[in-house]
Design a protein with these regions (language model features):
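Long, intrinsically disordered, low-complexity Ser/Thr/Pro-rich regulatory/activation regions
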Residues: 238-259
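Short coil/turn linker and secondary-structure boundary residues
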Residues: 128-131, 189, 205, 213, ...
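N-terminal leader/propeptide segments of preproteins
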Residues: 11, 24-126
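An amphipathic, hydrophobic-aromatic interaction surface with interspersed Lys/Arg
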Residues: 1-69, 141-234
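Hydrophobic, aromatic-lined core segments that form the binding pocket/scaffold
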Residues: 79-184
């Protein structure tokens, strides 16, 4: 399922029919003292992306009792994630972190029950089972800016052949520099690096207020700033060399597709 871009950008929990409210965590929740820490967050994300084979390898690596019996064709990813007590509890913790409600395991029906928050009496509002587990995981990853069709930044529209030539020279230089860098030196989309870059160039966000953003909002701001910088460079080329192909509305093009 694809949530609306507007809804994901709002930062509010979003209701998934038959399940509950999914959410993108705020950066506050990832801090080492007041949150779960960045390392734990990465573990949670990795868990959401694991397929059946990854889970089997994890259970065997941890040497959980009974792990060797899970490699059966009749078991899907949800089954492998929940048949062993240790992995089932990890799965519950991970899913709960990206939801507004708490989860309780229902052994009789082999499913997670989604419990209403702040209810006077226990109230089930949804469930996560072997039939909707993949959809829930995919949607949670979307809210963390993973699995979205970003592609490259929208192509810059050149005003004339001269501006195109200058643009290609700049891009060629950047590509050449990137090839010279070692693998360790290549820019990474780590949250720490993105937070630092946004705080350095954004007119409003700084280290005092940026942690109020959700993960989705941070990545969106980062890619928007990157695209705007490309648009600004193209406008500078146009202002110096002119041309009749330049369109001022190019900066309005969305960076996300199919939303």
């Amino acid at each position: 399922m694809r949530f609306d871009y507007f809804d994901m950008l709002s930062g509010d929990p979003i209701y998934l029919q038959g399940v509950g409210h999914l959410r993108s965590p705020s950066l506050h929740e990832l801090r080492p003292t007041s949150g779960i820490g960045y390392r734990a967050y990465n573990i949670y994300l990795n868990f959401l992306t694991w397929d059946k084979e990854h889970l089997l390898k994890y259970d065997q690596l941890m040497q959980y009792r009974g792990a060797h019996r899970l490699n059966r064709k009749c078991f899907n990813t949800f089954d492998v994630a929940t048949l062993l007590t240790q992995t089932r509890e990890l799965c519950r913790v991970v899913l709960s972190f990206f939801m507004l409600e708490d989860l309780v395991w229902d052994e009789a029906h082999r499913r997670y029950l989604v419990m209403a928050q702040d209810a006077e009496e226990p109230c089930v509002i949804g469930e996560i089972n072997r039939d909707n587990f993949d959809e829930v995981r995919e949607t949670m990853l979307q809210l963390n800016f993973i699995g979205l069709d970003k592609g490259d930044a929208p192509p810059v529209q050149h005003s004339d052949d001269k501006s195109k030539e200058l643009w290609e020279k700049v891009q060629g230089h950047l590509k050449e520099q990137a090839q010279k860098e070692s693998k360790e030196d290549k820019p990474e989309y780590h949250l720490s690096n993105i937070i630092s870059k946004i705080c350095a160039v954004h007119p409003s966000y700084n280290l005092l207020n940026i942690y109020g953003l959700t993960v989705f909002q941070l990545y969106d701001a980062f890619f928007q700033v990157s695209y705007m910088r490309s648009s600004d460079l193209n406008e500078q080329i146009f202002s110096n060399h002119g041309g009749d192909k330049f369109k001022f509305e190019n900066w309005l093009k969305p960076i996300l597709k199919n939303l």
